[in-house]
Amino acid sequence: MSVTIEDIARSAANWSIEVTPAGATKIDSFADALAEGTTVNVTFLPGSDPLDTIAISKRLADEGMNAVPHIAARSLQDSAQLDDLLKRMTAEANVREVLVIGGGVDKPVGEFDSTMQVLNTGLIQKYGITTIGVSGHPEGSPDISDEQLAVAIEQKNEFARKEGISLYMETQFCFDANAVLAWEKSIRQAGSQLPIRIGIPGPATIKTLFRFAQISGIGPSMRFIAKQARNVAKLMTVQSPHELLAGLSAGMAADKDCLLQHFHYYPFGGFAKTAAYAHAVEQGNIKLLPKGGFEVAPE
């Protein structure tokens, strides 16, 4: 599929980015790296304090960003804790959007085992949150079977219809555009209507990407980056997601019904560097390459 600079810039608009509470302490000013209103997800990692997630969400809101804190189901104690966290998120950080995930914990620490259990409490709606993200898995999950994933997508679509709430899927990071496009088409044909934010690995060394892929990546993406990492001489080479973005943009432009809507960046190579790259792509400050993909034009 062919793609134009306009296709890529259009697909890259309204991107979002991720930050950990620990990583946020190294960022002096979010406003220096991001345009006002940029969506920034704040993680709630296993073993971390959810109050740190709220504190960074408040800081982001104070700097004019749309803070989207994670709610990790299997890291919550009970409904009372969930209620308290949502109350704090909305009152202290003016949160109006959250991302609800299962969370990377083998054994739940409390009463919740899945995203749907959190959604079905009704507590998110109680606090006036109008937009909810849930996780998507284009390449499957090491913890959940494909059949279970299909059922979960069906349940989330039904929840969105029943509650009349804006629900979207945000995915793990990927490297293979064809795998993502095939997954999107398959879940759409199965009846899913949820818009999708695709996880994009920001520019980083192959060594760094391989490390994160070992933790999270499976399927085509893991094979792709493992092949790159075999060349020791290239381990410290910075790899950008230009071919992935071009491939996804081509697929989005070619299919008006495609559910892919936005890109969500994982800043593995640095927050400011990833934000600058995402902004350049969104602005169309790129040059198409003869063999596919593009390069960011020098300023």
Model-derived features with residue positions:
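Short, surface-exposed basic-aromatic patches at helix termini and helix-loop junctions that form
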Residues: 59-62, 86-91, 184-193, 279-286
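A short, acidic, flexible beta-alpha connecting loop/helix-capping segment that sits on the rim
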Residues: 265-273
